[in-house]
Amino acid sequence: MKRATLFMLAAAAFVAASGRPAAARELAGVNMPETLSVGDKTLRLNGLGLRKKVVFKVYVGGLYLETPSKDAAAILASDQAKAVRMTFLRDVSKSQLKDAFVEGFENNAKEKAAAQRAAIEKLYSLLPDVKETQTMSFSYLPGKGTTISLGENALGLIEGREFAEALFALWLGPKPPSEDLKKGMLG
């Protein structure tokens, strides 16, 4: 009996000392990992926010950076690896996604978007229908470009820093989908 109790205490002490194997932050029932690997870089979760459309919860978005920051302009101007990860809370069609991106480029990066027309058309061609609980990611690596992924599957790569600046402005620009989403992503 004493031996079993001693074993249980030792096991409990080991678990307590080791902590959680993978820390995460939670919002609206979605757990976002504290770190994300993009190429050979490890990015840290800068912040996460909730995208709502009218009264509907659409997705939880997480912003990942090499160097965390609360300054949207500095993040957009920096040529560091970065990613936005969106976990959807409802089904969203390709058409609905495209409409949201069109509006986002119009509101936040109109001039840059005009110069990046071909890259943006490629983005639109890559957008999938997204189901509830699926995760879509946009991961930028300097010198390589932005990889668009659904879950673990890469949908395509769009080269160029200028495209990445226009894309990330959708969430961090002057007119994001919602101020709460932007504030959350900025931590």
Which stretches of residues belong to each language-model region?
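C-terminal segment of classical bacterial N-terminal signal peptides
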Residues: 14-21
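Bacterial N-terminal signal peptides that target proteins for export
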Residues: 1-8
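Short polybasic amphipathic segments
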Residues: 34-36, 145-148
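Short strand-turn-strand beta-turns centered on an Asx-Gly dipeptide
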Residues: 150-152
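Flexible glycine-rich active-site/ligand-binding loops centered on an Asp-His dyad
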Residues: 155-181
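Short, solvent-exposed mixed-charge patches
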Residues: 186-187
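N-terminal secretory signal peptides
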Residues: 23-77, 111
